[in-house]
Amino acid sequence: MSDIPGPETSSYNDSQAEISDMLVVSELGVKSQNKTILEEVSFKVKKGTSLAIVGPNGGGKTTLFRALLNLIPYTGMIKWNDEVRMGYVPQSLVSTDLPISVEEFLRFKCKTDFDSCIKSVGLENDILRQSLKSLSGGELQRVLIAWAIVDNPTVLLFDEPTSGVDIGAEEPIYDKVNSLKKEIGITILLISHNMHVVMHYADYVLALDKKVLFFGDRKSLTHSQLLSIIYGNEFALSEEEFHKE
């Protein structure tokens, strides 16, 4: 596995890493202007599994992604498997006013065997011909997923992939993400505020509020228990109320 140390790397035992691990994070810490953003964050992600990262606003979820992408300084250890090839799906493009079609946008990245690239992500010809700025929120997210996976990544990082997307368009996006995991074994890390999505699509859950509140198998939690862990008991629905939604 490959080490991506922070500027102040703490002690780390290599025996913690196994060949089946895509990612091992140990004692991760991030500070900004002497303010603690993340503290003593440790978890593992197995190859071919999905991890949902949840927590209150300001809890450090996006900061964690920035550290995993080596975009900010941190302490502790981030250890990726040697096979790692990362794809990143942001909440949105910085600008959707680019005067180009979806096909031109994707060809910029997929320079060989374009037809195979497009087939793998399931984009229809009518979407390929549209301009980026004409796309709906759901269509744009599908294009961003396509952009992320045309290089055959082994890991995909999703930062609120359905933020700003109509409710009816959310499920097809997550179905596509789930199929990538099942069909080609991509490891998925997903930031989401949507507990319904977390409880239906994630294998494991990491709840963050600067520190780790919970890390474990999603099946070990009910929806109500997860809400209680993150927000306190007053926000937890009963299981009956949840299933009525």
Where are these regions (language model features)?
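Catalytic Walker B motif of ABC-type/P-loop ATPase nucleotide-binding domains
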Residues: L156-D159
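Conserved ABC ATPase signature
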Residues: S131-L135, E139
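H-loop/switch region of ABC-family ATPase nucleotide-binding domains
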Residues: S192-H193
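H-loop (His-switch) and adjacent beta-strand-loop-beta switch element
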Residues: V205-D217
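ABC ATPase nucleotide-binding domains
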Residues: H223, I230-E245
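Conserved ABC ATPase "signature" region
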Residues: D113-I127
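Hydrophobic anchor residue at the start of the ABC signature
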Residues: I145
